[in-house]
Amino acid sequence: EMQRSLVGSEMCIRDRFTLMWYCVDVLYGFAHAERQPKGYDLEHVYKIRISCNPTQIVPCTSEDSLQTFWFKPMEEVLRRIRQYPAVESAATWLGTDTYTRGRVYQGYTTDSVHVVETTVRYVSPEYFDVMRIPLLQGNVSDWNSTASPLPAVVTRDLADSLFQTSAGAVGREFLDYYSGGLRYRVSAVCALQKTDDYARYGPFVLTPFPGWFYEDQYLPFISLRIRPEADTDNFAARFYQDMMSQLQVAPFYLFDIQSYKDQKIERDAAEGITPYIRSARLIVIFFVFNVFIGLMGTFWFRTRHRRSEIALRMAMGSSRGRIRWQLLGEGLLLLALASIPALMICINMVMADVTFTEATDATWGRFVICVSIVWIL
């Protein structure tokens, strides 16, 4: 009976060890990806959306009318935003956003044969200060949308893909794969970037606003960095209340303002990431408790069936502490024996690529860390 009980306990611990490892592995994948730098700093950064009143739009058929009725009012909106006491800096941009599914891609090449699909952001020069993008080489002093070739800031991996090395990439030129006449010159190389906490790094390019932005009267987003002491929970509501009337510069008006922290919360909830992580944590807690109860039950069962042996050992001079440590050692040995087949199952799962690898690679270092965490738990 005792042998059957031990075999049953070992199988129970093996199964729970495997499931606990899988959940810990998932949590580790999310945590490790979240700790990796995104290539920009979103703390104390807010996104403003400006809209326009259809009844106040003036048809612009010339460059002068565009400047008078579109770009000058937009510049006035930006000027008023920058004058707000809590604002450190503000910038306009268009293209790929963070914590959303909105992506803008373009293909780039150096030889018109090999194309590198790249994530694109069109930005004003102040964007690099607002987002605190670290430049590894070069600078953005020549940020001019009328220059030819157009200036561009590329991530290190894009420089590697285009030029086979990021070293010495500043000053080199590349082409728009789909519009061969559109040329770019690398002004700077920046750190690796990704679109959100759990995404993988990918090639990014940041360039000035293209010609169609000015011709088709696109509305850019506005990102602003505020002073840390002003970043309170109600800042967005306070800013909206203070600036709603001031930003009514025909044809524009303030539509909304949102922090990237809130945008991340909404995206995680919409994509199911938050409940997924919560479920994994609850499963880990459940199995930790389950294994603890199983080990305690096994310890209690073995102790009750070995009362005569324990009494004999005490009669022979063994102390209570020594017997306790012996039984605990046997329990740990049982756990070690049960973990051997569990480890084989876990290794097979890694080899079969059925673990969570969307955000983090399944490396042996990750495997050892997760197994160690399960053992400690």
Place the predicted regions along the sequence by residue.
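Intracellular coupling helices
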Residues: 1, 293-333
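Membrane-proximal extracellular/periplasmic loop immediately following the first transmembrane helix
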Residues: 26-115, 147, 346
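"Rare, low-scoring activations can occur
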Residues: 73, 77-78, 82-84, 150, ...
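Single conserved hydrophobic/aromatic residue that forms the stacking wall/gate
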Residues: 2-8, 13
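Small-residue-rich transmembrane alpha-helices
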Residues: 22, 329-377
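Beta-strand-rich non-transmembrane domains
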Residues: 86, 114-122, 129, 136-153, ...
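Membrane-helix entry/capping segments
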Residues: 247-284, 305, 350-371
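Selective detector of the "anchor" transmembrane alpha-helix that sits immediately C-terminal
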Residues: 279-299
